[in-house]
């Protein structure tokens, strides 16, 4: 072990004496590059935050479009819009859970329109389910025909 220790200082001393200027120049460049990396990483972190904020999906635009289609002269507050958005998310989650359960009962890996239709009948009450099924059938027919 002693010879290894002797070899390392022997290698460093001649190298240090021969190129002290050459070592300083790259040493100065490396911290500059090192300083730029955290700034770039910080900028990338900001971009990630912006992307995360932009990826929040809501139904606010669609709620507003339907409202203006049904009642053009009526507005909606931001609090009411938030309530409607959470209501739609809740119904969507219930329908997805029920249709997944139905697909599992039938031992199918895929949720088809039949599972969705049955889930709508189970989750939504009475007349609302009938209207939802008819509108859904109409939308699927329009989609497949075009």
UniProtKB/Swiss-Prot annotation:
There is a cross-link at residue 142 (Glycyl lysine isopeptide (Lys-Gly) (interchain with G-Cter in ubiquitin)). Residues 1-52 are annotated as: Disordered. The lineage of its organism: Eukaryota, Viridiplantae, Streptophyta, Embryophyta, Tracheophyta. One of its GO terms (cellular component) is nucleus. Keywords: Acetylation, Chromosome, DNA-binding, Isopeptide bond, Nucleosome core, Nucleus, Ubl conjugation. SMART domains: H2B (SM00427). This is Histone H2B. Its main location: nucleus. One of its GO terms (molecular function) is protein heterodimerization activity. It comes from Nicotiana tabacum. Residues 1-16 have a biased composition (Basic and acidic residues).
């Amino acid at each position: 072990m002693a010879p290894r220790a002797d070899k390392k200082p022997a290698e460093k001393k001649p190298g240090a004496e021969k190129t002290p200027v050459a070592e300083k120049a790259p040493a100065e460049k490396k911290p500059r590059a090192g300083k730029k990396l955290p700034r770039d990483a910080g900028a990338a972190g900001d971009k990630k935050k912006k992307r995360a904020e932009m990826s929040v999906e809501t139904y606010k635009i669609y709620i507003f479009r339907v409202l203006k289609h049904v009642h053009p002269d009526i507005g909606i507050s931001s609090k009411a819009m938030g309530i409607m958005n959470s209501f739609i998310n809740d119904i969507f989650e219930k329908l997805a859970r029920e249709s997944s359960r139905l697909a599992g009962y039938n031992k199918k890996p895929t949720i088809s329109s039949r599972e969705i239709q049955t889930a709508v009948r189970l989750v939504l009450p009475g007349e609302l389910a009938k209207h939802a099924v008819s509108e859904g059938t109409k939308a699927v027919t329009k989609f497949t025909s075009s």
